[in-house]
Design a protein with these regions (language model features):
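Core structural elements
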Residues: 65, 118-120, 126-128, 368-385
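Charged boundary/loop elements
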Residues: 31-33, 37-93, 151-167
């Protein structure tokens, strides 16, 4: 537990340099980007009421640096774990460092002398071949302060955010966004402007963001600290790069800042009377006809580029019928006039690639560990895509998955005498075992043989802990 207050760090405070290291940052990002979605219940204000009267926004720094808020922020960062930043400090080392340096660091923030560390660049491949998503990993100390800022600002801005915005917000998620899409389609809005903002996080105009923040936040110290985080720079391949444009994607603060910036677009769409759904920077505007959608696109682009200084990707932005678009991994179709969901083919491909990775016969995993990893992935995947009509898809997918699992065992048994012994242990008739144990048709073909299927039956694989997509899906349907 922390004592009175907390910390933010400068490299000069540490007694030794730490070597940069590369780690997988995806889990931390996934957890921490959703972190600020734990705040008070959201309320609504009128469109023109930009002044918050029930929050004191001129003394926010004291609220941010209050010991209870900082302790809460520390616990969040601690629970999320995640890789270290440029100073190499791990989450496990954080508490000791904070105890030794908290007073000095807090005083630096109060005096306006605190200088955040640069973020560490991590590149994650996108679905589009050759493209990467650039993440910025803050130091664990900077993550604490970003989390502390987020916890104070979130309830203030929740009162301003649109009901049609769903990304990284309290008690809202992708399923809520999809249900709103469904409602719009059922009301006859079957054409959409599928809006793609080109490299949103990398191209945000910092001065515009600061302008928007300053309308609500009257404590200049908080504005200054946020600006310092935006300008902290990045360490990429050991080299420092300035960050005068854009904001790092990966810390606890970035999801909130992105929603604050794009709330300007939400307000403009609402003012013009459009139906829309936005999840983070994924936005769809709904219209009743193609001509109306084309007109909407032509009219909104000048606002996005001329007023918000963001760039619309004209290659990926399009006007289309709802049945032709992909949104949050789903596709849409209408049955008897009602909008329904499918898993988009690209999402199926991505899922199968992950299954191939988890059932790779050469990864050296133990069978129990593999069954555990498969269970974790399949449960999460089905929970997310459970709104889709996919029973037939999952049944065929389960058949393919079981084939891959049987191939793993057939490879592990290697020698004919081992195969003979294993098949006998599984209760197979000795009259057939000898021939099957000496088959030379290749692992994939042999593992699909009817005797092997009978020996490694669906029930046996389930007994050994291997999951199926269908069983998880049926549980969702029952609930």
């Amino acid at each position: 537990e922390m004592t009175s207050s907390l910390v933010g760090s400068e490299m000069c405070i540490r007694d030794r340099d730490r070597q940069l290291h590369i780690e997988d940052y995806l889990q931390m990002v996934s957890a921490e980007q959703k972190e600020y979605a734990e705040v008070s219940a959201h309320q609504r204000i009128t469109e023109n009421n930009d002044i918050i009267t029930d929050f004191q926004t001129d003394n926010l720094m004291e609220q941010i640096l209050h010991k209870d808020n900082l302790n809460k922020a520390y616990k969040k960062v601690k629970s999320n774990k995640g890789a270290g930043g440029v100073d190499g400090m791990s989450v496990d080392e954080l508490l000791g460092f904070l105890k030794d340096n908290q007073e000095q660091l807090i005083q630096q923030i109060k005096d306006g002398k605190y200088k955040p560390n640069p973020v560490r660049r991590v590149e994650i491949p996108k679905e589009t071949k050759g493209e990467v998503r650039k993440l910025g990993v803050p130091t664990v100390v900077d993550r604490v302060f970003q989390q502390a800022i987020t916890q104070v600002l979130t309830p203030i801005y929740e009162k301003q955010f649109s009901e049609d915005s769903f990304g990284f917000r309290p008690n809202r998620g992708a399923h809520d966004a999809l249900k709103q899409c469904q409602t719009n389609v059922n009301d006859g809005y079957v054409y959409v402007v599928d809006m793609d903002l080109e490299k949103f996080f990398d191209t945000v105009c910092q001065s515009k963001l600061i302008e928007v923040l300053s309308r609500t936040i009257k404590d200049g110290r908080v504005i200054s600290l946020i600006h310092k985080y935006l300008n902290a720079g990045v360490i990429s391949r050991g080299m420092f790069e300035k960050t005068e444009v854009g904001m790092p994607q990966g810390g606890p603060l970035s999801p909130l800042l992105s929603n604050i910036m794009l709330n300007e677009l939400d307000k403009e769409l609402t003012r013009r009377g459009h139906r829309f759904v936005r999840y983070a920077d994924d936005c769809m505007i709904f219209c009743k006809s193609r001509k109306s959608a084309e007109r909407t696109l032509n009219n909104i682009v000048p606002y996005i580029e001329g007023k918000l200084f963001l760039k619309v990707n004209r290659t990926k932005t399009c006007v289309a019928h709802i049945s032709k678009v992909k949104y949050l991994g789903y596709s849409f179709y209408r049955y008897k006039g009602i909008c329904r969901f499918r898993v988009h083919p690209k999402s199926v491909t991505k899922m199968k690639n992950k299954i191939r990775e988890l059932t790779d016969r050469h990864n050296g995993w133990g069978n129990e560990y593999r069954a555990l990893k498969l269970t974790q992935f399949i449960r999460g995947w089905v929970n997310y895509f459970g709104m889709a009509d996919m029973k037939g898809l999952l049944q065929s997918n389960d058949k393919w998955l079981r084939h891959r699992i049987r191939a793993i065992y057939w490879k592990q048994w290697k020698k004919p005498k081992t195969k003979y012994r294993k098949l006998k242990e599984l209760g197979m008739n000795e009259d057939f075992i000898q021939w099957h144990a000496n088959m030379r048709q290749g692992i994939w073909n042999c593992s699909n043989n009817r005797l092997v299927q009978f020996a490694l039956s669906n029930e046996k694989l389930r007994e050994w802990g291997y999951p199926t997509f269908t069983e998880f899906y049926l549980k969702i349907c029952e609930n």
